[in-house]
Structures are given as C-alpha cells and as structure tokens.
C-alpha cells in the first residue's frame, strides 16, 4: 500500500523537506509500505540491494557473520532505520547482513528507479542520502586504524565495536572462546579470564557460545 507522504517528513531521508516539495514528489513518485510480523526477513546477506528499505516503526535484529561463519554479531536496532543504503550503488550491490523483524514493523520500500527520480527532483533528499552514506563510510574508514591495546579486555571490546553496524544498544557475539582467542592473538584462558572480569563489572553476560552486551555504549 502507499505510504502517507506527510509522515515521511519525520524520517531521516526526508528531514528538512518542505510541504510544497513533498507535494511535487507525491505526484511523481510511488512509495510503498508494508506491515511485517515478528520474524519476517527484511533483507538477507548476499541478497541483491535493489531498493532503499526504511523501517519506520518497530525493532529489527541485524545479524552479521564472518566470512568463515566462525563468529556472528547480532544487534537489536530501533526504528527509524535505513538498511545499508550504501549498497544500493557501487561495485557490490548486495547486503552484507541479514535483517529480521523482532517486533511488528512498518517498512517503506523505495525501488532504485524511484530513488534516482527522487535524487533528481529533490536536493533535500539527495543531500540527506549523501550525508547518511558519507557518515557510514567515514565511520568504517577509521576502524582499521584504531590502536590494538595490550589489555585483553579492551581488545575484546574493540573487536566487538569494530564489527557493529550501530555503536550503541544491545548486542550479542556468538562464537567459541577458541575462535575469539585466535582472532585476538591470545590464549583461550586469557579470553575466559578477561570476559569474566567484564562480567563482574556487569558490562556483559557470558553464556555458552554467546556473549551478551546489554548496552554497547557502556563498554
């Protein structure tokens, strides 16, 4: 079904857009929305990115896996959420994570042809999209240059933060301690001791093959 155009003004891609500009867009561009149930897949890893997918309401689980599938990070993300807009253009136009509805979600989908039309018609839309993609690119470009700390606890924290889509909120790292030890260049015992020190500080919860972080911004 078609989305209420006036509600778009509250969403990141349309912030700052005047009502007259929105009225012109409404006549030329078709923007559809759907209501999804809990568990519905909104985008899958390696699926072609052929549209901008914007979650207007609800909560989403984003799962990102290593190339060898030896570890996975699951993030709880809140609306409004634009799902990997940087992948609609460029060399690799495929999603690198799987996004699943954790609650009832209202999802807006703008097909690539309509995205190009919006960019042509509206400078506000064009600047908003460019700013979102540029901010994401700048955040990613700094990750490889963070200094590797000798402290194992800080290494674990950096490992998790560098692999998250959003730098705050609830996260899960699903892996074995032996894998984490291999990735960080230390022993399994050192990893185990460091994790339990972080758990004693109530910064995370250690379970079998799962490390839960209630609030990443506190790490």
Which residues fall in each region the model found?
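Cyclic-nucleotide recognition modules
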Residues: 29, 73-131
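Polybasic "coupling" helices that flank or enter modular domains
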Residues: 102, 120-185
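Glycine- and acidic-residue-biased ligand/ion/polar-headgroup-sensing regions
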Residues: 50-63, 79-80
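Cytochrome P450 core scaffold surrounding the K-helix E-X-X-R motif
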Residues: 63-69
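Phosphate-/nucleic-acid-contacting segments
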Residues: 161-219
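Short phosphate-coordinating micro-motif centered on Lys-Gly-acidic
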Residues: 41-47
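A cytosolic small-molecule/anion-sensing beta-strand core signal
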Residues: 37-38, 56-57, 78, 103
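Cyclic nucleotide-binding regulatory module and flanking cytosolic helices
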Residues: 1-38, 82-83, 87-90
């Amino acid at each position: 079904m078609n989305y209420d155009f006036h509600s778009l003004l509250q969403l990141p891609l349309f912030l700052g857009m005047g009502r007259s500009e929105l009225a012109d867009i409404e006549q030329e561009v078709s923007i559809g929305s759907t209501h999804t149930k809990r568990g519905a897949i909104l985008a899958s890893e390696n699926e072609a990115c052929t549209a901008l997918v914007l979650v207007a309401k609800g909560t989403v689980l984003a799962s990102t896996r290593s190339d060898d599938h030896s570890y996975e990070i699951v993030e709880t993300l809140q609306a409004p959420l634009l799902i990997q807009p940087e992948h609609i253009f460029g060399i690799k136009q495929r999603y690198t994570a799987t996004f699943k509805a954790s609650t009832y979600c209202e999802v807006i989908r703008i097909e690539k042809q309509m995205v190009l039309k919006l960019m042509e018609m509206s400078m506000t839309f064009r600047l908003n999209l460019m700013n979102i993609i540029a901010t994401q690119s700048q955040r990613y470009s700094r990750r490889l240059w963070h200094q590797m700390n000798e402290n194992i606890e800080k290494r674990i924290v950096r490992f998790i933060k560098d692999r998250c889509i959003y730098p705050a909120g609830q996260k899960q790292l699903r892996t074995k301690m032996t894998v984490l030890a291999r990735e960080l260049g230390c022993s399994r015992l050192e990893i185990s001791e460091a994790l339990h020190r972080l758990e004693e500080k109530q910064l995370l919860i250690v379970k079998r093959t799962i490390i839960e972080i209630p609030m990443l911004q506190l790490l």
